[in-house]
């Protein structure tokens, strides 16, 4: 069994359901220390974070990943136990195989190989891991970035190992992500009998024109490779369940995925002004998941394009699609950020898996990226 496959299996066997780490980072730190890295464990709240560095000075290249996984769901739905890694027909199965213990293991092996071959390399190679990516993402990289800001720690380049590939390893290069902003709107009315609407105020009727305007609005036309900003209503609830009662309250949950044309405060102000214009009696609660980031043409992006093209046999698609990642907390430090990882077809699903051949190739891919950036 290869080094990367053995380490991936060891990590999968640790049931690190978010925000638990289950000893993953301790095992990784032991390996990185043996390779000559300085390791710092940053326990913030109930979350484990690991900052491992080799070398000094600029440029600083960070390999960013997470050791936590989403819950596996019912055991009986899986072909084999989610935390018992199994290889069948050239495919490794287990929770975290693709998202993202395979990438983390490949980072570690690539870093070990790189510093063994280039012990006096230029700049700093760093590995940053958290156990709070799949959950609330409060005491993970978000908090670590605050610590870095206080210390004056700079980062030039960040490669996140999120599973970015779609059909074959290296076919997609993630060069940015949209921002995410969620809102919970409560519109207040007056409950009453449906036969006496003049004695009640129906919050559904009151809110409908405002919601229609929100849904119909075109926020922008997109930005570079970003699709247009989108607002989606995700949940609507009102009423008692009886068809003869006008509800006294309406609750609406919604989410915006937005381009760099916007930031959360401006979007919040726009939506608040719209609701005020409709003279609603309402309360609105916001949750900011992260601002958008975008890496323009530069050394990191051009090197990644070349390396992925060599591995995939064709230039990668360069995309800003998908959800959010921890790179959104690193980008505001001034870092150029990309995401490169295995195929994402099975992430968060029952029988999550990664092709063994892809896993075996990942360390060489990451090592080549590191060498092109820190050696030339």
From Swiss-Prot:
Any coiled-coil regions, as ranges: none
Residues noted as binding Zn(2+) 2 in the record, renumbered to the chain: 99, 134, 348
Q: What HAMAP family would the database entry show?
A: DapE
GO MF, one annotated term: cobalt ion binding
Positions bound to Zn(2+) 1: 66, 99, 162
The UniProt keyword set, sorted, is:
Amino-acid biosynthesis, Cobalt, Diaminopimelate biosynthesis, Hydrolase, Lysine biosynthesis, Metal-binding, Zinc
Q: Name one Pfam family in it.
A: Peptidase_M20
Q: What is the lineage of its organism?
A: Bacteria, Pseudomonadati, Pseudomonadota, Gammaproteobacteria, Lysobacterales
Protein source organism: Xanthomonas axonopodis pv. citri (strain 306)
Instruction: State if Metal-binding is listed as a keyword.
Output: yes
- Role played: Catalyzes the hydrolysis of N-succinyl-L,L-diaminopimelic acid (SDAP), forming succinate and LL-2,6-diaminopimelate (DAP), an intermediate involved in the bacterial biosynthesis of lysine and meso-diaminopimelic acid, an essential component of bacterial cell walls.
In its UniProt entry, what is this protein called? Succinyl-diaminopimelate desuccinylase
